[in-house]
């Protein structure tokens, strides 16, 4: 099994732990981070290769890739290859890892919006209670 490699270590941003990722999401993200081209932020390991590296089935890897996409950490685009006989075949997915700062900023903006909505709901509920109760 051949893994992507950039030496004996890779950097994983500390902020990744602020997002509440599951162990599976973190494992898949870490492997993609290990494989990525630092300039383009892209990599294209196969689902099978990812699964072997993180010791998960291919279906489980697909599930975590989908969840990482939903969280906005990565994008996964299908690719095509042309065989020697001229046939078009599906290639590996092309993964693009988004800059962690953008992901964190979006995460905090989402949390703030949820908090503001909850605060507004509480305010409206209080107003309704005050109107309904006799003075």
Predicted regions and their residues:
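Electropositive, intrinsically flexible nucleic-acid-contacting patches
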Residues: 1-135
């Amino acid at each position: 099994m051949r893994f992507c490699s950039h030496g004996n270590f890779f950097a994983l941003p500390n902020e990744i732990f602020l997002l509440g990722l599951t162990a599976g999401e973190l494992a898949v993200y870490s492997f993609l981070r290990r494989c990525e081209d630092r300039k383009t932020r892209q990599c294209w390991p196969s689902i099978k290769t990812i699964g072997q590296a993180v010791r998960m089935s291919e279906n489980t890897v697909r599930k975590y890739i989908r969840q990482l996409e939903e969280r906005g950490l990565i994008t996964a685009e299908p690719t095509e290859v042309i065989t020697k006989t001229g046939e078009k075949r599906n290639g590996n997915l092309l993964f693009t890892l988004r800059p962690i700062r953008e992901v964190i900023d979006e995460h905090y903006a989402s949390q703030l919006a949820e908090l503001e909505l909850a605060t507004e709901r509480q305010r409206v509920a209080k107003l309704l209670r005050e109107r309904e109760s006799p003075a």
